[in-house]
Amino acid sequence: TSFAMQIIRGGKSRSIWVPEAQIGRTALTQKEIVKEGYPRLWNHQQLAYGCRLSTFFPFRSFDSGHEHLMAGVMESDNVKRSKFYEVQQTAKELQEIYARTGEMLPVAKAAVIRDFQVDWTFENGYTFCPDLKYLREVYKYYHALRSQSIMADVISSQADLSGYSLIVVPYLAI
């Protein structure tokens, strides 16, 4: 999701990589939980949120061992099927975008602060409201901005705030 991408990128303030992206069934479930078209959609979304590299694991399904339960871009019989062609099409599209634009990082004028100390305090320490989940509250503010088409970064309280016109601080721990 865009929120997860922003949390990861916001902690680094630079482009990110997505290792071991999911293409189909996983070892945890045998259902085909990734519908056709979703890996392409996710890769385009990753690019829009500052991802520089995304890899799928496994590329080819295994014949044995725990990984034989996981779908790959290609199944263990090496026959190219729809997943392979979808990844191939996506790679071509992303290459064309990179050729025209170069590396892209989103430019946001709004930021939502995610403070790890506050996160720890509310999740592990004493709180006045046991149902209060700090990360859920951060998401609510982020989602409110995005639902109004306002691009927002999720950044640390230690980050440089000078480039932002709006800064949302969900909670502070003193």
Task: State each model region's role.
Residues T1-I174:
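Carbohydrate-binding surfaces of carbohydrate-active enzymes
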